[in-house]
Amino acid sequence: VRIIIATVQIPFVSGGAESHAEGLKAALIAAGHEADIVAVPFNPAVPERIPDQMLACRLLDLTEIHGAAVDRLIALKFPAYLIPHPNKVVWVLHQHRAAYDLWNYPFEDLSASPRGVLVREAIRRADQQLAEARAVFANSKNIANRLGHFCGINSVPLYHPPPNAGSFSCARETGEYFFFPSRMSATKRQSLVLEALALTKKSVKVRFAGLADSPEYGKRLKLLAAKLGVEARVEWLGFVTEEEKRDAYAKAVAVIFPPVDEDYGYITLEAMLSSKAVITCEDSGGPLEFVSHLKTGLVTKPNAAALAEALDQLWQERDLAAKYGRAGRERYEQMGLSWSEVVRQLLA
């Protein structure tokens, strides 16, 4: 079977979505299929041009390549899932959230645009085309709930393992830090962690890994750390290799991941594979599908004081952090996540 995986690429931005597409491609090839990725350029920073990019996707014809039929299109992201195909399956990583739950959220460009309302309505109308697919899957229950709530579209949650799942481990000796690996953006809430650090009673230290959405945002976070007086307890690792990331997981006391209504979040699963407790928030979305409060981690209210209390607790009670981490690893094993099951469902 010849399969195209349709997604988008924001130039100079790479993260979980790109790993997701590559993982799916590898799984399809391993199952004996011919598969490739078509990544459509997408620039959400210019809201007025988003309808043009939607139209460009709608006009693409991927039904055949060099005279050979494409048997199936598996579409992952907005606006690539608008590409028409008679045998299309959509596995929604996320919609354009600025038109939905992140409307009016700080640092989102759409609501601040003079034509923002018009573009938002165009996006919402276009998303109704999801119903044309032969099947709609969601990357998590959280995404499935959003699709139902905002679009009235039913979808099936379909989990998958993170990249290189078999490579994660837990070190015998932990370091003196919590680990927070993530793209730096307002929705990931690195700023909340900095504010919590300023309120901790213990000398908690945090290592942040990942690049900022923009150089300006990265500078803003560092200025905030200085303003709060916590810069000596923060380490900015920036880009890290996969090996460096796994090593940081392995030696961490625990993992912090408190995003705003996250879609899925490899970070939670990678922490569980590394036998690390996860500290997250009540409104963090995807992580809550895997983190059980007082069993595999701590779930706090989304404010600095509550998060600081959780940081202090696991910083002081290392045995408890290790216990939660072991339980997280057991929970991951019980879920039985596999790419072979993903392929089976997408091609059914």
Residue ranges of model-derived segments:
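Aromatic "clamp/platform" in nucleotide-sugar-dependent glycosyltransferases that forms part
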Residues: 260
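Glycosyltransferase donor-sugar binding loop
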Residues: 205-222, 238
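Conserved donor-binding/catalytic core segment of Leloir-type glycosyltransferases
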Residues: 170-188, 194-201, 206-207
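A short, well-ordered alpha-helix in the C-terminal region of glycosyltransferases
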Residues: 306, 313, 320-335, 341
